């Protein structure tokens, strides 16, 4: 109690930090002893009414004299169970997400496009600190910037003598940010959530100097959907990462996500989901279906959106809402853009967890036979030929000793097909697109990592998103990667400047003779080769578009 009282007095006595924006407005933040935070700054007009689903419009009203001391609400979320076969859990979660309690703990709404800047205490304009811009994950269905506190990373940067400024932003998810279909393409409104991120990066370029940051030293980083979003920003406008003639960012870090294996915005599955949302919203007979969707209440749109499959429903990573090639900003199939060199030329770090697919395979426990697994893959990958499905199933057999969690032998096979499906989902969505990117990226220096830290954890192993724990909440030996090495990369473009106990090798190709991966296990860090599951790589990525969704 005494310590808490002393700390509260220090906070109250310390002068509130200020920053001056590019337009001359001065704003006030929160002094939190070890850092100073400016939270919930609007960077776009509220995307409501006629702006629903559209790319964002920059915020233009004066902020002069305003205080920004708490996070803004997250953007609207969908129920991640989506159209679960059993109505009870879906209905219960729908009710919870719309309850006053949920809104009090995790507020969300359409007026949500805000940005947060957190800096070490005492940072002044002219400090020119490197800037790390975080893009959150959540399957393009849920999430918000307030869920990822940056204090651990900022503290680590100060202790290293390599202080950074941490920026995070909200962006629209689910139908609000990634609705697809021909009507969306015709209007030019595809990938609104990516546009939100881009406008946030432009806000950083315009304003971060007033907080003590260096706009020429920006690193973008993210996990899961955030990592895929980083990739989309690398591919934006065929790799043009400039704004007002200068780069928006000089480096990128991707944690569990690379190119999105998705059809165009007017492709069959995106159109199917659009039609489903339209019908559920009661707009099926409207002459202008988009106008109808813009006119309905937010609660009604939430219900219609949550009538589509969610990440935790049976179709799993065949997500209803994804970044998709729109012919304008994501100009083509993302794998082709990387092959053709249409990717920003910046240094990158990209890595994965060893068992990325286990959590997502829990929604398909009713698949127990080879025949059912084949049907599951046929339904998931509608472009794949019978021969390609045969090759996939041969590369990922039902032999439980070969599935995920990997290297666990006969254990963790909660159904005869669970480990097989977990292996396919993890490799298709996360692990092997990383290898494809590294083999084809023609840009800057490349580093890659793979974690096996939780290999002894039953059923889910070193599962998707466990890195967030060691990055933002708890310190372990892997924090040397997720904090220290990333901070060194943002400062010096070299993760080895963090003083790791092993040298992190540069990656040239998956076939290079030396080690090319930094690996993490339960005991520490070591290096190894990116040469596992080559048959799976060939099955999935000899013709990547066969497995697009």
UniProtKB/Swiss-Prot annotation:
Disulfide bonds join 75-112, 283-292. InterPro entries: AB_hydrolase_fold, AChE-related_enzymes, CarbesteraseB, Carboxylesterase_B_AS, Carboxylesterase_B_CS. The keyword Coiled coil does not apply. Glycans are attached at residue 366. Keywords: Disulfide bond, Glycoprotein, Hydrolase, Lipid degradation, Lipid metabolism, Signal. GO terms for biological process: lipid catabolic process. This is Lipase 4. The lineage of its organism: Eukaryota, Fungi, Dikarya, Ascomycota, Saccharomycotina.
